[in-house]
Amino acid sequence: MAITALLTVATGCGKDEKPSSSSSSSSTSSSTSAASSSSAASSSASSAAPSGTAPLADYSNLLVTAADIGADTTLGPPEQNPGGVAGVAVTFSNTSKTHTITDLLVVFTDAASAAQGAKDRPASLGKYVTGAPQPFAVGTNGIIVVGPSPDNTKSVTYVVFSEGKVVVDLEFDSGPNDAAPQDFVLDVAKKQDDAVKTRTTS
């Protein structure tokens, strides 16, 4: 999954460059695939936070909950400030682990930096999903990419947007030729957007 690359980009940024966020899937949706590898984030990314990101802290209150995703959705333990970058990451999955959503939030010092981070993000997504970015009507600079993974082992739906000072990366992984339903993706993205919008302090 793309957490490692995102955080590597973040730590290489100056104050005007930003990272993004990522997610893991639901049980009630008809997506179908083996889970993504979000736990490698902190070990693979630099521990020096870029100047454009916020102070390290507990940002888990900004995440959506398993109840927001679906009835039989399980929640992995949140990873605080993965890779030494301000934010939080978590993976949701159904009980059989065939559908996952990886949710990564990266917190910046200001909304302009976060918006630029979301705008720059599509250039790095080709490593994780094969498809052309399309506009996505959530947050600022929202995009969505739907397609197979480069190795054709799973279907991937990747969503990126910013909300205020936060960049949200949501990655929905499922079985080959069984992409997450678009209405489900939109619902999860809106819930995450609302959570950030209502819980972020200025």
Indicate residue ranges for each PLM-predicted region.
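N-terminal export and membrane-targeting signals
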Residues: 1-3
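C-terminal motif of bacterial Sec signal peptides marking the signal peptidase cleavage site
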Residues: 8-12
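N-terminal "mature-domain start" segment
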Residues: 14-91, 141, 175, 182-202
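Short Gly/Thr-rich strand-loop-strand
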Residues: 66-82, 115-158, 194-202
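Short, surface-exposed beta-strand/loop micro-motifs that present aromatic residues
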Residues: 86-94, 155-163
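A short acidic-to-branched-hydrophobic micro-motif
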Residues: 89-116
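Short, well-ordered beta-strand elements
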Residues: 103, 165-174
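A short, structured loop/turn motif at beta-sheet edges
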Residues: 108-112, 136-139, 162-164
